[in-house]
From Swiss-Prot:
UniProt keyword list: ATP-binding, Cell inner membrane, Cell membrane, Kinase, Membrane, Nucleotide-binding, Transferase, Transmembrane, Transmembrane helix, Ubiquinone biosynthesis
Membrane-spanning residues: 24-44, 510-530
Descriptive protein name: Probable protein kinase UbiB
Pathway where it operates: Cofactor biosynthesis; ubiquinone biosynthesis [regulation]
Catalytic activity, EC: 2.7.-.-
Main location: membrane
Membrane-protein topology: Multi-pass membrane protein
UniProt enzyme class: transferase
Residues reported in the UniProt entry to bind ATP: L132, A133, S134, A135, S136, V137, A138, Q139, V140, K154
GO molecular function: ATP binding; protein kinase activity
Gene: ubiB
Organism of this sequence: Pseudomonas aeruginosa (strain LESB58)
GO cellular component terms attached to this protein's record: plasma membrane
NCBIfam families, A to Z: PRK04750.1, UbiB
Amino acid sequence: MKLLAVRRLLRIQRVVIRYRLDDLILELPMLPWWLRLLGATLPWRWLPRRKLELTRGARLRLALQDLGPIFIKFGQILSTRRDLLPDDIANELAWLQDKVPPFPPELAVKRIEEQLGAKIEQVFARFEREPLASASVAQVHAARLKSGEEVVVKVIRPNLEPVIRSDIAWLFILARLAERVSSEARRLHPVEVVSDYEKTIVDELDLLREAANASQLRRNFEGSPLLYVPQVYWDWCRPKVLVMERIYGIPVTDLETLRDQRTDFKALAERGVEIFFTQVFRDSFFHADMHPGNIFVSTRAPWSPQYIAVDCGIVGSLTDEDQDYLARNLIAFFKRDYRKVAQLHIDSGWVPAETKVNDFEAAIRTVCEPIFEKPLKDISFGQVLLRLFQTARRFNMEIQPQLVLLQKTLLNIEGLGRQLYPELDLWATAQPFLERWMRERVSPKQLLRNFQQQVEQVPHLSQMARDTLERLSQPHAHNTPPPEWKGSRHDWLGRLVGAVLLVGAAEVGLGQQLEAWPAWVMLAGGVFLILRR
């Protein structure tokens, strides 16, 4: 392992020198003066250099490609963090292609047989040794099950884990070094960025997780004309092998073929937007890797086109609170109610509770008002979220991984939609959906469902209330809310009153099965104050 780490370090050094990435590093404004001076004395900086007619973004992209699959994937993920990167670098990194030569079919067969505990001929009536596709983490082969179904078999590359551990270890070293030497770097949380990447890549190595994600997404859109997700064949799925239904569709970027079959491009673009908002707000479970390589269009009914989604290795989800705040943020933003946008960020706990609303509102207005100089149909939803996140970061907004995934997915969907149909008015498509969803949140049916859920939490809330009151009664207790009660001081003080009411209800009525009417009143008031948003 140590030998591998040293070899990787030497490899990284060679690539840095070849593409003169040291020039880019020394140009960083966050670099302290003494480190800039030390960097200028590096031995290779005194040697003759060949002229590179490349932008800084192109040099970084080529360097990551030379460093191999793990760095390529890191660059792809980094390209989605436009709240951290300059636009020119983020745009260049978005061109990184996760395509590598396939590994020998003999190794694929061996790994499949090890995982399934059976010979390939015992499971498949036909197995194509030439892979359909090959990427940094896995490759895919076509096959037919003994029972006759046409399938694809995805298999993780052999001997990948040691390389991943070594590369991630070096990324952590670089991230910690950056945090140690620069306060500006600390603001960008490089260690958290690498941790997020580590979780993503580790999750992608577990194909059972991907199978479960695909099954959930398929169930959510069962019978839907919007989206089809291939069936998972669980009997033949293992941690390193995934067997799914083989689908036949047109790549969403193959505009010529889609045009030849008379696809309704306007409907196709609008359905992409509808799929996104349905996943986020109806299901709170969304495919977070919807780049063009993972999306196809069914050849059936081109006048009413249906998407096909594959590769569910990366998914995201939102809590009820995040859904609510996100919807209200978007609606408030498009109404130019910057005060409400600022207050919602504070109430949600996305920025510190002590943030001054007036200052935050002014910062949001300064960044976002120019966006509205464009016609509404030309405004990018993804850019709206991006600008909000960039502004909030200046006010110490903590990284919200689920929101980063959401923004990345929205940018993908939006870019794809406008490629299919340039006149796509995303707001006109999304606004009715968001407003309908907000109305349904307060419908009698939904309120009844919420009340039933709240009643189930009463025993837990009563205990939490007791714990909180006991904590606050301690002589040296800090006047801070429990971590479960994130939000503004006004919110948690209200919840504290709710805690007192709950304990009172427990004392007055719970012992007599709530026969005393005051217990009912205190119980209802306590539940409302604690659970309200």
